[in-house]
């Protein structure tokens, strides 16, 4: 069996669900391996994440917010998507900036607020699984965890990350109502309905 055939078989066997505390280290390892700070320029062209989290923050996201959706490959984590109310994200200056500008945007005729929207992302798919429908499966499962609580999801995409922009625009169907700058970087604001 070729590597390609083995990967296809592994993709069909992925289990999608909410992360447990035992999977925290697998999520953290995938986050670190794909963080822009840990990638060369060529690797960043294939997508990257920019959010850093401590083990304690990840524990809270898993245990208190039920906000980590994973694709499991046996005992490992092949992909994840993070999602939580703005209150969780407000501990980061970047997200406090997003909260500050929410009211500048509307979606479906509604002005965005902390009460009617939540922050989705980052999402990360292991390189071996990219382009195989894993993003779509993890994205849909993540939406289901929040759809009863918030009608609107909001995220950001670094303008230097065209792979993420394409995934969120084409595969996730998210709109781009505007852009914003933070700390010398340029971002797209992405908005979508919080249901499958």
Residue map of PLM features:
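Conserved acetyl-CoA-binding loop-helix of GNAT-fold acetyltransferases
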Residues: 125, 131-144, 170
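Conserved beta-strand-loop-alpha-helix junction that forms the acyl-donor binding cleft
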Residues: 121-130, 155-165
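Conserved active-site alpha-helix within GNAT-family acetyltransferase domains
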Residues: 136, 159-178
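Conserved N-terminal entry element of GNAT/NAT acetyltransferase domains
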Residues: 1-25, 29, 33, 37-38
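Conserved acyl-donor/pantetheine-binding loop and adjacent beta-alpha core of acyl/acetyltransferases
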Residues: 82-122
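A short helix-loop-beta-strand connector motif used in the catalytic cores of GNAT acetyltransferases and
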Residues: 56-70, 87-93, 119
């Amino acid at each position: 069996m070729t590597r390609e055939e083995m990967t296809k078989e592994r993709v069909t066997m992925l289990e999608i669900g909410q992360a447990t505390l035992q999977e925290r280290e697998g999520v953290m390892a995938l986050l670190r391996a794909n963080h822009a700070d840990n990638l060369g320029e060529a690797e960043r062209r294939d997508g990257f994440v920019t959010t850093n989290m401590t083990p304690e923050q990840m524990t809270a996201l898993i245990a208190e917010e039920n906000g980590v959706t994973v694709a499991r490959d046996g005992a490992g984590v092949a992909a994840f998507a993070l999602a939580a109310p703005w209150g969780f994200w407000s501990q980061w200056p970047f997200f406090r900036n997003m909260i500050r500008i929410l009211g500048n945007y509307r979606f479906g005729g509604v002005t965005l607020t902390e009460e009617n929207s939540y922050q989705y992302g980052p999402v990360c798919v292991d390189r071996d699984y990219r382009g195989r429908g894993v993003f779509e499966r993890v994205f849909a499962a993540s939406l289901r965890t929040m759809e009863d609580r918030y009608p609107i999801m909001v995220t950001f995409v670094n303008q230097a990350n065209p792979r993420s922009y394409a995934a969120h625009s084409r595969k996730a169907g998210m709109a781009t109502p505007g852009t914003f700058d933070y700390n010398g970087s340029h971002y797209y604001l992405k908005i979508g309905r919080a249901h499958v």
